[in-house]
Amino acid sequence: MSDAARLLAEIHAARALVRDGLRDAKASARPDHARLWAHATRAPHGPVDLATVRAIRSDPTTGRRYRTMLGALALAHAPLAAAASDGAIVRRRVGAFALEILEAADGAPPLLVLRSEAGQMPRVIEAWLDDETARLDLGAATEGAVVLALDPAVPDAALLGRMLRDPACAVFLL
């Protein structure tokens, strides 16, 4: 075998090894079930594993696994929701729950009102729109409703309000 042929064979072998190594590295970079579960059940405003977040956003398979897990955990969820607005109120239906965004006047922040006639109220809301996500604690219910201020000074609350107005936003009530 000539030197040129041997060198060409070595280049092809090295390329195949690198390609296989990258494929194996990508598969091993996917978070396991326990890491996805820990991320799905985390407290709002708690620490997050950035490697898990990166995998959820960049790998479609991991993103689907995570959203499936959230859907199983959720009291109600809507992968896509139809939103209706008369200019002052935005309403969404998510399972047995009704979400309304009430625009406030006189400089007050808009309010998210979550109502249900079911007995159990969710504790957390998580919304997904494209590669953005917002997760907030809903607090305690009062007379079958939860009210959350979507204060523009609070980045997560403002992001949630903007996302909920988009019909393509996925909503999980946990």
Language model region names:
Residues 1-67:
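N-terminal amphipathic alpha-helical interaction or autoinhibitory segments
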Residues 89-174:
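C-terminal, beta-strand-rich globular interaction domains
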Residues 26, 64-105:
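Transition segment at domain starts
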